[in-house]
């Protein structure tokens, strides 16, 4: 500050004034891009908002907006929530932590903690069980990382703890050979369909039974018409949030989003005397839930280039194989299983190139590509140019197999942006899950 003494105000003889000296930072030492910034529009809480997709992403987003005073409706072709990849009735909140520093590790930790608090209400209403999740290492490298994680997250000692063989057997209730693991006492499993039904009923969110196959911008008021397969307008949305997983690519404004349709099969099998002793979820190469009404669930497969909706016997074997590769003692839990006691279900995840979700405003691909074309020549060039985005259009998708972990976090991000609230996360995390991130990256690498 530049401080000076001048004539005082009123009866005061003198007073001190100060003027802030803004030091301009050289753009060559601190490159800056504002591609993530969009022009803000005035939002009235009473406006009707519509969400495409009634899975965990769409339902949590609807609730986050309803809590902020918006009128929200969900459009889903099934006419009910908790379908498609969100039809998993024994879904695990899978912990994913890293010994590395940076925004990715921070994002996973923040999202996981937010999810833990978010789902307490559902566990209290018997929509799952907060039985704890035991994470077992699948390699010597992971075993070493577990010790490093314990050191790195000492301030999070109540969130998880490093446990030895004796503790593992006590916590899990079964005999295992593995020497160490990480135990997350506040995590567990949930029935995603029941969670979706519970929150949409509690917050009185209407479900419109229509198959939305197209959207179009109404330029006179920047609203969006939503069409069915007959090109009939279903609704006119003042604001529209697309939350239909990999199917975002079927809509023209979001067709550029790089989302892969990835098949996953879950195996369900009848419990036996030994497996009934399992008290918590165990995660390693795959996962295994405790007996729920005499049924265990384990999984899940990651089938690339396989779009079959039929249950595959080979995938059941693969899921059992994942358990045994984690610890040979799992053989005691799955031996002598009759094929008639095995069932399962198939779902299709929507995954991104970097395995992080898309959450935020939908960029105008052509305008962004033109506006930031200079990045092809100089990837480090700084600019004050803000991004080009479609008005009143948002996307929440690409959570892969971590829908339960990421959904509450992404829902809050989108609801905050629509409400013109300040984001509650570090800037770099916001950029890492921003829908425009691949446009900027691909321009810098001359891919587009």
Regions found by a protein language model. Give the residues of each.
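C-terminal catalytic lobe of FAD-dependent flavoproteins
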Residues: 9, 336-448
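N-terminal Rossmann-like FAD-binding beta1-loop-alpha1 element of flavoenzymes
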Residues: 47-74
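Glycine-rich FAD pyrophosphate-binding loop
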Residues: 67-87
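Central helical "cap/lid" subdomain
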Residues: 82, 230-283, 309-316, 331-334
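Dinucleotide-binding Rossmann-like beta1-alpha1 core, especially the glycine-rich loop
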Residues: 90-172
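Active-site lid/adjacent beta-loop-alpha segment flanking the redox-cofactor pocket in flavoenzymes
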Residues: 97, 274-385, 389-391
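Helix-loop-beta segment of a Rossmann-like dinucleotide-binding subdomain
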Residues: 99-100, 125-135, 159-202, 206-209, ...
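A conserved short coil-to-beta-strand element within the FAD-binding core of flavoproteins
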Residues: 208-224
């Amino acid at each position: 500050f530049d401080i000076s003494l001048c004539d005082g105000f009123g009866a005061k003889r003198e007073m001190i004034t100060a003027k802030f000296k803004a030091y301009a930072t050289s753009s060559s030492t601190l490159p800056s891009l504002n591609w993530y910034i969009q022009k803000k529009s005035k939002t009235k809480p009473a406006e009707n908002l519509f969400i495409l997709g009634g899975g965990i992403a769409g339902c949590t987003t609807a609730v986050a907006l309803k809590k902020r005073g918006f009128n929200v409706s969900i459009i889903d072709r099934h006419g009910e929530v908790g379908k498609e990849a969100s039809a998993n009735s024994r879904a695990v909140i899978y912990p994913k932590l890293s010994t590395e520093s940076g925004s990715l590790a921070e994002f996973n930790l923040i999202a996981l903690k937010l999810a833990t608090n978010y789902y307490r209400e559902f566990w209290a209403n018997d929509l799952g069980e907060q039985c704890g999740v035991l994470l077992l290492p699948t390699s010597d490298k992971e075993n070493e990382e577990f010790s490093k994680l314990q050191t790195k997250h000492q301030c999070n000692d109540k969130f998880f703890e490093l446990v030895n063989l004796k503790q593992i057997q006590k916590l899990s209730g079964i005999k295992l050979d593995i020497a160490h693991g990480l135990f997350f006492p506040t995590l567990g499993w949930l029935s995603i369909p029941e969670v979706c039904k519970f929150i949409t009923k509690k917050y009185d969110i209407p479900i419109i039974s229509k198959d939305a196959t197209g959207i179009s911008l109404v330029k006179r008021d920047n609203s969006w018409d939503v069409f069915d397969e007959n090109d009939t307008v279903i609704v006119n949305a003042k604001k529209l949030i697309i939350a239909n997983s990999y199917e975002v690519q079927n809509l023209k404004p979001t067709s550029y989003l790089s989302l892969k349709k990835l098949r996953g099969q879950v195996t369900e099998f009848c419990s036996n005397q030994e497996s009934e002793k399992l008290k918590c979820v165990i995660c390693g190469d795959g996962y295994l839930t405790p007996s729920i009404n005499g049924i265990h669930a384990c999984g899940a497969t990651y089938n690339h280039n396989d779009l079959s909706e039929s249950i595959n016997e080979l995938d059941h074997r693969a899921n059992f194989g994942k358990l045994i590769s984690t610890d040979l003692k799992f053989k005691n839990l799955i031996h002598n299983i009759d094929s008639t006691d095995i069932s399962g279900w198939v779902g299709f995840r929507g995954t991104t190139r970097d395995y992080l979700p898309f959450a935020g405003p939908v960029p105008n691909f052509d305008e962004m590509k033109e506006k930031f074309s200079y990045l092809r020549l100089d990837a480090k060039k700084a600019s004050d140019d803000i991004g080009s985005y479609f008005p009143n259009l948002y996307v929440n998708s690409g959570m892969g197999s971590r829908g339960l972990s990421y959904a509450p976090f992404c829902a809050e991000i989108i609801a905050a942006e629509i409400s013109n609230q300040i984001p509650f996360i570090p800037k770099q995390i916001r950029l890492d899950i921003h829908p425009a991130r691949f446009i900027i990256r691909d321009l810098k690498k001359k891919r587009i």
